Amino acid sequence: MKIYVDADACPVKDVIIFEATKAEIPVTLVTSFSHYSNAEQPKGVETIYVDSGADAADYRIMQLAKKEDLIVTQDYGLASLALAKGCIVLHHKGYKYTNENIDQLLQTRYLSAMVRKSGKRTKGPKPFTAEDKEKFRALFKSIIAL
């Protein structure tokens, strides 16, 4: 298993790096050049930089990921593609994307886009909380322990 992180706006990178390093599982952070950092990463953690274009990180992750790899993303489109490839996919708020829930998530995203296109406003996501982070940590640890 390898871990790929859609890292541009991922609030749980620290959890992923800490837990994966302890378990000696390689992590690849995929992020745009606009988030460039020369900060040192622990052994087993690689950062791949991609252009800032829409979905560039998603395409790179899909190019690299193999069946049964673990992907962390908040992007439903990437999650859908990764599930079809046989990957395990987690959201940073601590839930696992499945073939059973992805269609509903994509449908909700589409309907919200149509509402916004018509000029109306939709609710944004709820703020990320410490409880969300701990929920993610528990799920992540249970997945990498398998």
Swiss-Prot record:
Top-rank lineage group of the source organism: Bacteria
Intrachain S-S bonds: none
InterPro entries, per the entry: UPF0178 (IPR003791)
Family of the protein in this entry: Belongs to the UPF0178 family.
The name this protein goes by in its record: UPF0178 protein BCE33L2782
Organism: Bacillus cereus (strain ZK / E33L)
